[in-house]
Amino acid sequence: MLCVIYRSSKRDQTYLYVEKKDDFSRVPEELMQGFGKPQLAMILPLDGRKKLVNADIEKVKKALTEQGYYLQLPPPPEDLLKQHLSLTGHIRTESEQ
């Protein structure tokens, strides 16, 4: 199974996976409007792969088969201040506030 991955022209770190190059026929129009003009990122064989870097390969395969596309959204932003305070013991629990 091959998948074609496109980068969003409107949303940073947002990718659309489809089964065939330039075939967005199964992707909802509303999604395409919010996604912007798709920019080809790569063509990737999924057969024989056990994992992908930023997506669950089994979810990708299932979505491609069932709905014809998979939308990869950016990871949630890291709260570096909260991480720092937690590591240094300066973060308060709800009972301390």
UniProtKB/Swiss-Prot annotation:
Residue ranges annotated for the YcgL domain, each copy included: 1-85
InterPro entries hit by this protein: YcgL-like_sf, YcgL_dom
Pfam family, one: YcgL
Alphabetized SUPFAM superfamilies for the sequence: YcgL-like
Protein name, per record: Protein YcgL
Native species: Escherichia fergusonii (strain ATCC 35469 / DSM 13698 / CCUG 18766 / IAM 14443 / JCM 21226 / LMG 7866 / NBRC 102419 / NCTC 12128 / CDC 0568-73)
